[in-house]
């Protein structure tokens, strides 16, 4: 590995001036403003919930936004992942030797609280760039160059980022897996016993409807980097685009499709967000009528009717369960959504839940087209 990622620092978004993402993250999802920077046509606002930090880069300017890159993308998008590394200068030299493109060379930023060094790396995943950051000893609330904002306790719905899902073009997962392994130290995480890293996990959506190929990657256990999931479409007999293909079309290529946010209490979190205006996906009606589903929900210690009313999916067996709920797109262009996830011993991603999500998104798309 060339520049092993040790921790996810933040996820950055690029949106036009006036786009309400920052407002929604605060009012709807319970993220609290952390720090702000306004310079050169950019307004950069960092928001935090637990250990999850989102950086919203709003506007445009003659220079790059600090700690990020202007992707000059035509639609709002999650455009950057920032990782903590031990040695930015050494990482940049090693990555350049591998032929990687570094649009922003190692740059030092100082303020009264200390120093941070960063570089920005282009990735082979569409408009997604990667920031490598070294800030050991920095004493501020966020990063040099940002003005800290008054700290206000939030609802605590989200504790950290559980996983990141990239929507990829068909057949590109093996190449992306090798790139993230060689450059950042990610390695294959099997989602099923005996899984072939080159093939990933195939999840069929139903007869003739294609499905998904998922490949999960993780860093060594001593690092605090979320699981990275590569998702690509499997062709079906139906000629209609599925949601991965629709994302690629609307987004203009591969990119970060959704972020899984861990919540210690998915019932309270989803209820609170819904009351604040969050639009949650509705699972297929048949999901909760599956044979054994009620018993499974009861075995996990939950009430079937409550999960159904809030659209929460549950999968697992024995003492290992996974609960998930998904938002509708945060952007009108349908290029990004969020997931809430609570784990009761489960470490993977339930195949039944994946199928249910697949069907939910397809049904939502059909309703939107008919509106």
UniProtKB/Swiss-Prot annotation:
<dbReference type="InterPro" id="IPR005956">
    <property type="entry name" value="4OHPhenylPyrv_dOase"/>
</dbReference>
<dbReference type="InterPro" id="IPR041736">
    <property type="entry name" value="4OHPhenylPyrv_dOase_N"/>
</dbReference>
<protein>
    <recommendedName>
        <fullName>4-hydroxyphenylpyruvate dioxygenase-like protein</fullName>
        <ecNumber>1.13.11.46</ecNumber>
    </recommendedName>
</protein>
<feature type="binding site">
    <location>
        <position position="258"/>
    </location>
    <ligand>
        <name>Fe cation</name>
    </ligand>
</feature>
<dbReference type="GO" id="GO:0005739">
    <property type="term" value="C:mitochondrion"/>
</dbReference>
<dbReference type="GO" id="GO:0050585">
    <property type="term" value="F:4-hydroxymandelate synthase activity"/>
</dbReference>
<feature type="domain" description="VOC 1">
    <location>
        <begin position="7"/>
        <end position="135"/>
    </location>
</feature>
<keyword id="KW-0560">Oxidoreductase</keyword>
<dbReference type="GO" id="GO:0046872">
    <property type="term" value="F:metal ion binding"/>
</dbReference>
<dbReference type="GO" id="GO:0003868">
    <property type="term" value="F:4-hydroxyphenylpyruvate dioxygenase activity"/>
</dbReference>
<feature type="binding site">
    <location>
        <position position="163"/>
    </location>
    <ligand>
        <name>Fe cation</name>
    </ligand>
</feature>
<keyword id="KW-0223">Dioxygenase</keyword>
<keyword id="KW-0408">Iron</keyword>
<keyword id="KW-0496">Mitochondrion</keyword>
<feature type="binding site">
    <location>
        <position position="339"/>
    </location>
    <ligand>
        <name>Fe cation</name>
    </ligand>
</feature>
<keyword id="KW-0677">Repeat</keyword>
<dbReference type="InterPro" id="IPR037523">
    <property type="entry name" value="VOC"/>
</dbReference>
<dbReference type="InterPro" id="IPR041735">
    <property type="entry name" value="4OHPhenylPyrv_dOase_C"/>
</dbReference>
<comment type="function">
    <text>Iron-dependent dioxygenase that catalyzes the conversion of 4-hydroxyphenylpyruvate (4-HPPA) to 4-hydroxymandelate (4-HMA) in the mitochondria, one of the steps in the biosynthesis of coenzyme Q10 from tyrosine.</text>
</comment>
<dbReference type="GO" id="GO:0009072">
    <property type="term" value="P:aromatic amino acid metabolic process"/>
</dbReference>
<comment type="similarity">
    <text>Belongs to the 4HPPD family.</text>
</comment>
<dbReference type="InterPro" id="IPR029068">
    <property type="entry name" value="Glyas_Bleomycin-R_OHBP_Dase"/>
</dbReference>
<keyword id="KW-0479">Metal-binding</keyword>
<feature type="domain" description="VOC 2">
    <location>
        <begin position="160"/>
        <end position="328"/>
    </location>
</feature>
């Amino acid at each position: 590995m060339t520049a092993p990622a040790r921790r996810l620092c933040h996820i950055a978004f690029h949106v036009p001036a006036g786009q309400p993402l920052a407002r929604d993250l605060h009012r709807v999802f319970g993220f609290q403003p952390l720090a702000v920077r306004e310079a050169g046509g950019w307004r950069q606002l960092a928001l935090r919930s637990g250990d999850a930090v989102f950086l919203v880069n709003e506007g445009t300017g003659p220079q790059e936004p600090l700690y990020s890159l202007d992707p000059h993308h035509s639609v709002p998008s999650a455009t950057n992942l920032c990782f903590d590394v031990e040695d930015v200068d050494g990482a940049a030299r090693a990555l350049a030797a591998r032929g990687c493109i570094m649009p922003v060379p190692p740059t030092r930023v100082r303020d009264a609280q200390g120093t941070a060094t960063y570089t920005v790396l282009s990735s082979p995943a569409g408009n997604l760039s990667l920031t490598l950051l070294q800030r050991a000893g920095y004493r501020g609330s966020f990063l040099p160059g940002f003005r800290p904002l008054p700290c206000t306790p939030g609802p605590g719905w989200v504790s950290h980022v559980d996983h990141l899902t990239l929507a990829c073009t068909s057949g590109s997962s093996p190449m992306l897996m090798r790139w993230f392994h060689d450059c950042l130290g990610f390695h294959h995480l099997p989602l099923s016993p005996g899984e072939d890293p080159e093939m990933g996990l195939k999840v069929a959506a139903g007869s003739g409807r294609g499905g998904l190929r998922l490949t999960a990657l993780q860093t060594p256990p001593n690092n605090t980097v979320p699981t990275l999931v590569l998702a690509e479409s499997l062709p079906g007999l139906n000629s209609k685009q599925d949601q991965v293909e629709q994302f690629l079309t609307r987004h203009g290529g591969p990119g970060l499709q959704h972020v899984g946010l861990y919540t210690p209490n998915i019932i309270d979190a989803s209820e609170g967000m819904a009351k604040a205006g969050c639009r949650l996906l509705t699972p297929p009606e048949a999901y909760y009528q599956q044979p054994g589903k009620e018993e499974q929900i009861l075995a996990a210690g939950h009430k079937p009717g409550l999960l159904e009313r809030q659209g929460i999916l549950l999968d697992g067996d024995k003492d290992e369960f996974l609960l998930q709920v998904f938002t509708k797109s945060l952007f009108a262009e349908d290029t990004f959504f969020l997931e809430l996830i609570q784990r009761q011993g489960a470490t993977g991603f339930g195949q039944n839940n994946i199928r249910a999500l697949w069907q939910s998104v397809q049904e939502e798309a059909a309703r939107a087209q008919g509106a």
